[in-house]
Amino acid sequence: VYNKNNDLIYTWNSANYYVADVAVSNDGNAIALALLGASGGTFVSEVYILRFDSATPKYKFTFDTLISSLMSAGENYMLATGIDSAYTVAWDGSSSSNLNVSGVIRSFMTYESGWSALTCGRENNDQINSVKIIGQNGMPISDFEFFSQIDGVGINAAEVIILSDQTVCVYDHSGNLKSELTSDVKPLHAVITQSGDIITVDNSRMQLLSAAE
C-alpha cells in the first residue's frame, strides 16, 4: 500500500488466499481486497476492508461463491461481483447485501455519486437479460428486462445506457425507455456524462452521439 507520494505505507499478504482484485474508497480512506480460496472443492471468497493506518483488516466479509471483481460506488458501498453472483458491501463495514442476480453477469458500472447498474442473463441465450439499478444506499431500486444482447452499460445520476451492437438505449432509473441512438460502427465502450451526453469509443475514435433529452 502506497500513499499519494508513492511512499510505501505497509505490505499485506496472505498464505491461504489469492488476491483477485482491489478497490479504493471514493474518499480515499480505505481499501478493499477480494480474496479467493477453496474449501472442499468449492470457491470461498472473502472481502477485507483496511484503513491506511494499519495492515490489520478492519472488517471481513465471507461469501461461499467466487468474487473476482470489486468496484467502488460512491462513498457508501462497493460492488463485489463474480461470474453469477453480486453483492454490495458497505465501506463502513456495517453490512453486505446479496443482489440475487439470475444468470451470468454481462456487465456493470458505477457512478461516483453512488448509483450502479448491473446486467445479467442466461448463459446460453444472450438475448434474454435483466438490468438492475442500485441506489446510493447500496440497495436495488429497479429491475427491468432487456431482450437483446448487452455489450456494455453506463449510468449517471438520472439515466442508464445499454450498449447493444450499434445501438445505445437510454433508460431512466425506473426502466422506462427514453431514446435509442445509433452509432456508425459498433462501439467497444459507451459512457454517459453527468450532463447526459453519450460518448462512444471504438478502436480509432470517440463519437458524441447526442445529448440525452
Question: At which residue positions do the language-model features occur?
Answer:
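Long, acidic/polar, low-complexity amphipathic helices and coiled-coil-like
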Residues: 1-67
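Short loop/turn segments that connect beta-strands within beta-propeller blades
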Residues: 3-7, 51-54, 90-94, 134-137, ...
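A short beta-strand motif characteristic of beta-propeller blades
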Residues: 7-13, 55-61, 94-100, 137-144, ...
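Short beta-strand elements that form the blades of beta-propeller/WD-repeat-like
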Residues: 28-41, 71-82, 112-125, 152-164, ...
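Structural motif
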Residues: 39-49, 84-90, 125-132, 167-171, ...
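Eukaryotic tandem repeat interaction scaffolds
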Residues: 74-152
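C-terminal closing repeat unit and adjoining cap/tail of repeat-based domains
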Residues: 135, 164-197, 201-205
